[in-house]
Amino acid sequence: MAHKKGTGSTRNGRDSNSKRLGVKAFGGEKVSAGSIIIRQRGTSFLPGINVGKGKDDTLFALKEGTVSFDSIKRNLRNRKRVNIIL
């Protein structure tokens, strides 16, 4: 018979690092070409004029200018779009 209580095992105790997603440059901000505007998983925001989309759905500026947000109706729902105004 044990005189000490054995330690139990648990399936918890892990946590992933934060991915630092979100808007990095807000509307009206000046950005240079190549600047990251939004880090996202999936396409919550669509790329508009002078905005490119990376393979991980990150939106970045193709040209220097000012960030602008608007919404467009697409497939019976409103989608958010990011543009760079020169």
Swiss-Prot record:
<dbReference type="Pfam" id="PF01016">
    <property type="entry name" value="Ribosomal_L27"/>
</dbReference>
<dbReference type="InterPro" id="IPR018261">
    <property type="entry name" value="Ribosomal_bL27_CS"/>
</dbReference>
<comment type="similarity">
    <text>Belongs to the bacterial ribosomal protein bL27 family.</text>
</comment>
<dbReference type="GO" id="GO:0022625">
    <property type="term" value="C:cytosolic large ribosomal subunit"/>
</dbReference>
<protein>
    <recommendedName>
        <fullName>Large ribosomal subunit protein bL27</fullName>
    </recommendedName>
</protein>
<dbReference type="GO" id="GO:0006412">
    <property type="term" value="P:translation"/>
</dbReference>
<dbReference type="GO" id="GO:0003735">
    <property type="term" value="F:structural constituent of ribosome"/>
</dbReference>
<keyword id="KW-0689">Ribosomal protein</keyword>
<dbReference type="InterPro" id="IPR001684">
    <property type="entry name" value="Ribosomal_bL27"/>
</dbReference>
<keyword id="KW-0687">Ribonucleoprotein</keyword>
<feature type="region of interest" description="Disordered">
    <location>
        <begin position="1"/>
        <end position="23"/>
    </location>
</feature>
